[in-house]
Amino acid sequence: MNAFNKANDQEETLYEAVLEEISSGRLEAGQRLKVSELATRFGVSTSPIREVLRLLQGEGFVEIHPNRGAVVKQGDANTIQNIFEVLQLLEPYFVSWFADYAQPEMIEEMEEIQRKIEEVPSGNLIEFRKLDFEFHWAICRRHYNQVAADLWKKLRKALNVHGAKLRISPVRYQTIMEEHQELLEAFRTHDAVRAEAAINKHVAGSFTQMSQQMRALGL
């Protein structure tokens, strides 16, 4: 690996690490991001931290203000709605294809992820969201259209960032488990129509839960 590629890989790893801190809520909306503190936290110099913050600013996750520096951007209801409107188009596209073409080992991988989700202790939203992402990414990453898959990945990460402070009610949590099982059953029987219906319900339910919380918080 040459020096250029190594530097790019390090920047990408650092970017993912900072983004994970934001999406997990460990770096909260409105929190000031001090370059020196982040450099110490991740064991790097200040230059790559500044570059990562510029990248995060470009993607709408961070705001950089003169004399104040960088802060984690506060999510809002309009952003959440815009993301979900695109996901409502992408998700059926992926699951209908997966229902038609998924091999047994692909479905088994999803079943294993779902087992892990169901074992997550109540209230551990960081681990739950990580595994929920993996569950859906197991569908998207195998699709032939990687442009669409990369767009989905970007939107889901954005959703996790903007919704980091939101909670999942016990009722919604149970519904998510049931909807995941409904998807798995549709995949096992290669029923694309059933899979589309399940994912449409799943996405709509998540949007309702998140948008209601956003409005309640005045965002």
Label each PLM-derived region with a short phrase.
Residues 9, 108, 126, 171-174:
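Short helix-capping and inter-helix turn/linker motifs at the boundaries of alpha-helical repeat units
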Residues 204-214:
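Short arginine-rich
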Residues 67, 90, 112, 175-178:
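Alpha-helix N-cap/N′ positions at the starts of helices
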Residues 58, 62-63, 155-157, 172-174:
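Mobile beta-alpha loop/short-helix "lid" or hinge segments that flank ligand
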Residues 95, 100-165, 178-186, 194-204:
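Conserved amphipathic alpha-helical segments that form helical-bundle/coiled-coil interaction surfaces
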Residues 1-100, 105, 212-219:
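Short linear motifs at protein or domain termini
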